[in-house]
Amino acid sequence: MKKFFTSESVAIGHPDKIADQIADAILDEVLKQDPLARSAIEVTVSTGDVSIFGELSTKAYVNVRDVATDTIKKIGYIEPKLGFTYDSVNVSNKIVEQSAEISSAVDQAEDDPDQIGAGDQGIIYGYANNETSDYIPLALQLSHKLMKQLKTVREAGDSNSYLRPDGKGEVSVEYGDDNRPKRISAVVLSAQHIEGIELEDLRARISEDIIAPVLPTELVDENTKFFINPSGLWSLGGPQADSGLTGRKIIVDTYGGAAHHGGGAFSGKDATKVDRSGAYYARYVAKNLVAAGLADKLEIQVGYAIGVARPVSIDLDTFGTEKVSIDKIYSIVDQVFDFRPLSIINQLDLRRPIYLQTAAFGHFGRSDLDLPWEKLDQVEKIKALLAN
């Protein structure tokens, strides 16, 4: 029986991603002044409007409107004909201070006075597989690459580009009997574009400029299906056509549907929120275990209680691909990794302004960025323990 897997990504100018980028841009500006700030910022974008709300406790002063409009400008919403532009949007700031009760629960963990407690209860997941050099599914890797290429081509064309900021991409991969990628079965790409372009010309240019440079030729055959702007012309996009909200692209942000998701989003949250820091650390653990050869793919689930440092549970799933006993993997995890929030923050150095760069094209598998949770710096330690 044939096995297929599909993942999607969205462009930097997708409404939900605009919201994520604004939230993380604000977070980064706050962290530049106050590394100990507590943040849980949410953003909505719609026709002519940006609303920023949530909780923030900090000594920093940040001009939220300026950060929001500068972010929108950098994304590419500049031309008046786009409807939603950096210099015309109404920005409302409804941020309030974090609850004192939550703050006191986090400041000192109930079970470990030297640690901070988890910022909330939550279930988080980390995942890695070895089918790509980035340790993420091939379908997701290619979907992100298509969206990066869309941005590159649009920005290279500057004001003469036929592309506009919004877009979506999707790749389907067929697997062989060895559970390795065999071929690309389908590609879907929808790109916002200028008015006045002919549909067939648009499709030909997207095929040549965006798709061809990204797809591995050895995985494309005569039966690969391409759906380029399958709904037809798409000149009206972005928040002018569709509202956006932080945290609404959590599968794009993580593993493209290959792993479970606990439901917590990332953008706008500081590292005391285990939705973010715990998920980053779980990815770090899974990636190092797979890179060390303990399994071909691995998922880890971690459960937290608010105000408590140590996880209430840790569970592993290797999907039958383990190369050593599951008990041995658990033992290595226990010896090498510390899932307490403050330990995670210190080990990965998460009180820095590094988050805006993650708010588009995925938080994991980012070989184009120097992200601490993507480092393979525990592999040799894991291998040494394996040898004992």
Curated annotation (Swiss-Prot):
GO terms for cellular component: cytoplasm. It is found in: Cytoplasm. PROSITE patterns: ADOMET_SYNTHASE_1, ADOMET_SYNTHASE_2. GO terms for biological process: one-carbon metabolic process; S-adenosylmethionine biosynthetic process. Keywords: ATP-binding, Cytoplasm, Magnesium, Metal-binding, Nucleotide-binding, One-carbon metabolism, Potassium, Transferase. L-methionine binds at residues 55, 98, 242, 273. Pathway: Amino-acid biosynthesis; S-adenosyl-L-methionine biosynthesis; S-adenosyl-L-methionine from L-methionine: step 1/1. It catalyses: L-methionine + ATP + H2O = S-adenosyl-L-methionine + phosphate + diphosphate. Mg(2+) binds at residue 16. GO terms for molecular function: ATP binding; magnesium ion binding; methionine adenosyltransferase activity. ATP binds at residues 14, 166-168, 242, 248-249, 265, 269. Binds 2 divalent ions per subunit. Binds 1 potassium ion per subunit. CDD domains: S-AdoMet_synt. Residues 98-108 are annotated as: Flexible loop. K(+) binds at residue 42. It is an enzyme of class 2 (transferase). InterPro entries: ADOMET_SYNTHASE_CS (IPR022631), S-AdoMet_synt_C (IPR022630), S-AdoMet_synt_central (IPR022629), S-AdoMet_synt_N (IPR022628), S-AdoMet_synthetase (IPR002133), S-AdoMet_synthetase_sfam (IPR022636). Its EC number is 2.5.1.6. Its cofactor is Mg(2+); K(+). It comes from the Bacteria. Homotetramer; dimer of dimers. Belongs to the AdoMet synthase family. Catalyzes the formation of S-adenosylmethionine (AdoMet) from methionine and ATP. The overall synthetic reaction is composed of two sequential steps, AdoMet formation and the subsequent tripolyphosphate hydrolysis which occurs prior to release of AdoMet from the enzyme. This is S-adenosylmethionine synthase. It comes from Oenococcus oeni (strain ATCC BAA-331 / PSU-1). The gene is metK.
